[in-house]
Amino acid sequence: ENVAALPLRQWKSSFKSLGLRSPLTLRGLESEGSIGVDVRRDELVESARLHLTFTLSPSLLPTLSHLKVLLNDELLQTVVLSKEQLGKPQAVDLDIDPRYFTDYNRLRFQFIGHYTMECETPTHSSLWASVSNESSLTLALRQLPQRDDLALLPAPFFDPRDNRPVR
């Protein structure tokens, strides 16, 4: 069966809808946080776009501080800001290679922060980054052909990877 002829659906979800109740706050020299994004067994990601809204501490040294964005341990982008942008909400849009997606996915954020060229306190209060839970992920999902096989039940009627509300 021609996969391109099968239905394509757009799915967009905020981090809040994915279970991140409040902004993801990363503290310290090196800290990280993540959010789960699952893809149904009978769907294939054809395209993906991350709209990331975040704020980095205004006290950071911009040449030594950054935010890494990873999907399933694949580096998507390292976000570096100028001194003028620090402390202000920022937004970046990242196109994600759909080949990085599997059934169960982990979108991870690693914060590397430095506030001085001297000896630093790893837990200093000026070392923080905040990833907004209003950030969002948009996926174009292609329906995959399914074979008639009772061994697949309860799929396609129930799929634990499906993060849509039950109807």
Spans of model-derived segments:
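Surface-exposed coil/turn segments at beta-strand junctions on protein surfaces, enriched
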Residues: 43, 50, 87, 100-102
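Short, charged/polar low-complexity linear motifs in solvent-exposed/disordered segments
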Residues: 69, 94-97, 126
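Beta-strand-rich recognition domains
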Residues: 1-67, 77, 111-167
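Short, surface-exposed tryptophan/glycine-enriched loops
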Residues: 89-108, 112-115
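Generic detection of short hydrophobic beta-strand segments and adjacent strand-loop junctions
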Residues: 35-39, 79-81, 90-96
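Short, solvent-exposed loop/turn segments in extracellular or other extracytoplasmic domains
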Residues: 62, 85-91
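Short C-terminal domain-edge/linker segments immediately following a structured domain
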Residues: 80-85, 98-101, 138-142
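Solvent-exposed serine/threonine-rich low-complexity stretches and specific carbohydrate-binding patches
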Residues: 66, 73-85
